[in-house]
């Protein structure tokens, strides 16, 4: 990540997420892997792109090379909107998350995302180089995201916003069928 504003925002996201991390961590869509490197526990960062210090590169985040119920915490920080097969990836996250584990998701609302990325594009080499791919969306509204997460087998246990309401976060648990 080459732009200073992007680094500041990433640092803010990490600051919001870190207190919720427990046990073994999997960061899906880890980018530069800064969250895992900032965590004091054991963690693995995975991404479909080699942004830098990624632990595991995968072709498809819906096919993770981990056993069932491996991780205590899974994070998707500013990631889910960039994943075209997001429902399958959420189901895969559910598979590798322990029954007592937590999923933590941060997301920018789509209207704010369009404005922000439009302003930022001239000085963000990563965004200009990579661009938006088919199936990616600018973000999710809170109701859209909560519905997607619920349909994928997750229940919200805590939610909030940060960056003056321009980003939202969700802490979720698995809905385990009886």
Positions of PLM-derived features:
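Short conserved loop adjoining the S-adenosyl-L-methionine
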Residues: 63-68
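A conserved beta-strand element that flanks and buttresses the S-adenosyl-L-methionine
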Residues: 75
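Short catalytic micro-motifs in class I SAM-dependent methyltransferases
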Residues: 78-82
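Conserved class I S-adenosyl-L-methionine
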Residues: 104-126
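Acceptor-substrate binding/catalytic loop of class I
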Residues: 127-143
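A SAM-dependent methyltransferase catalytic signature shared across enzymes that methylate proteins
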Residues: 142-159, 176
């Amino acid at each position: 990540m080459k732009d200073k504003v992007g680094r500041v925002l990433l640092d803010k996201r990490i600051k919001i997420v870190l207190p919720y991390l427990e046990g073994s961590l999997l960061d899906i869509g880890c980018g530069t892997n800064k969250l895992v490197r900032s965590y004091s526990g054991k963690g693995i960062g995975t991404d479909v792109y080699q942004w830098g210090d990624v632990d595991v590169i995968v072709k498809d985040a819906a096919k993770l090379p981990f056993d069932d119920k491996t991780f205590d915490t899974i994070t998707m920080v500013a990631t889910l909107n960039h994943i075209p097969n997001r429902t399958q990836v959420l189901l895969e996250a559910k598979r590798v998350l322990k029954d007592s584990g937590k999923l933590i998701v941060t997301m920018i609302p789509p209207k704010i995302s369009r404005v922000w990325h439009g302003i930022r594009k001239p000085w963000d080499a990563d965004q200009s180089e990579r661009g938006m791919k088919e199936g990616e969306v600018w973000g999710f509204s809170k109701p859209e995201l909560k519905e997607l997460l619920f349909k994928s087998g997750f229940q919200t246990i805590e939610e909030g916003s940060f960056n003056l309401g321009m980003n939202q976060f969700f802490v979720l648990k698995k809905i385990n069928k009886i």
